[in-house]
Amino acid sequence: VTSAGRGGNVLYLNDGHGVFHKATDALPTEGNSGSRVVAADMDGDGDLDLFVGSRSVPWKYGVDPVSMLLRNDGKGHFTDVTAQLAPELARVGMVTDAVWQDVDGDNRPDLVVVGEWMPITVFHNAGGARLTKMKTRGLEQSSGWWNRIIAGDFNGDGRIDFVVGNLGNEGSLTAVV
């Protein structure tokens, strides 16, 4: 998936021989251009669904754009299910990055979203039936100019950790190289 600017997003499919072709009817035509696209099987049906996060509305910087949750029908066609499954996600903020990761140990991918002038936001996945914004130990107060999030077991304790990049000195932790 790539951004087509004011024209929305475009999906390119591999033909199995290393050649990518534009899938003209795969994605919804409405919506802003995506700044970050992340895939996961959010509903447990065996195919990859998409979160398309948007950072800006053309010519209206600072206005929260529309981000989308797209369900894959298994044949490469995606339907916008944001209003039904995750209405709080539609205008979550100016998204710069996101990651699907099980944060609560239920073996379902939850969605963690970061962006400009917004808090780190976690959406709990209730088995693909609904994604709801979690109230999580002070993250509601984490507003910043977030630009990157990476998940991994960085300290070797067997649990997922997150490294989040922020421009500025608002945080309580500072990385020194």
Model-derived regions, located:
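Flexible loop residues that form catalytic
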Residues: A4-G5, M42, R55-S56, V103, ...
